[in-house]
């Protein structure tokens, strides 16, 4: 039984689209082959930034011959009914069979469909899949009609069996399938032929391409952690970033760098978020927990072992962190002045056109937190103060740049303003839990503010008839309801 190897080679595929594209390619091709009458033993799918690859083992050489029967009208039925049956089947009357039935003789149409060779079926299925591939975003280029996520440059499609390989005659616009591909864009750009999946993967590795994304992830993580350990440091785990970076490189080369002394005083969340979002760097911390370095992943091998790449990355990182330091210092100055400017600024920020501004909402939450405080063992005055402070960081420069830091920065700013640890922690913890695995706040002040925040949101949206429906919940009210239930259950012991 032959094995199928399909490679769709293009310009860089966005990392965020690769996992879905792998699954779509596998499902669409295998479903199409099975629907056409072929069977297979197994299928694997792979991706790099420049290629989607499908390998199918044990594909049947041809589809089975099929005999189909279709029951028609009785022999004494009106002529119009018989003519309609003939038109629908495309047969003439003398091609129909008469068979005895309980109600008399009935016409039957019999179709004999011979088996088809696998190459012809594969060519049809692959062409259809390429033309109708469900990319979230796609583009056209040149004068052709084909749409792809980035310009599709070549198609490799072969059926191999016992050492021989046959090129499948796939043609899409001006692209015709071949048995050749190429390696790394810079390290091995020349094209070369392949005869099987094993031959393909071996030659790609010699051409500086690591085909399996899981292997690239493991290589990046192992090399990064080993380099950090050798320097008495550790890499901050980040599974999402690891997957993304593995989708940006074909031949990962891990480089360990240092953060400039001028930026080591920034909060670790700021350093980590800035490096992750802007540079796709992993954060590296000392045993004390302070972030002191970073890991970047290059896509090439250099004669100076990455020194030039690392120097360039450190220069860009310094510029990014200079911005973050500027935001931090300005925000700290506002915090030490009492954060009144931020509170006034929230008066012009609409929470919902039927529920007022963020300032109005904060006042409601503060009043409610003061009512809840005695029930959870918190001081009412402190709970109200925490509620009025918790969302002020929404007007800060840092949260404006990195919205995901809301609450976390609020804790730092409350501390800089000289407020109590309970008030500062409430700024960070009142958003929790954000998911089923998140911890529920335990400090009484944080619990009072967290419950008040969620209750105000839920009752407010119910009051204006913005309830979640079966398929829509734009304000995440279900999640908020579950979170408030978890908080109440915790309080009940």
Regions found by a protein language model. Give the residues of each.
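Hydrophobic alpha-helical segments, chiefly the membrane-spanning helices
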Residues: 489-493
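Amphipathic alpha-helical "coupling" segments that flank catalytic cores
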Residues: 1-488
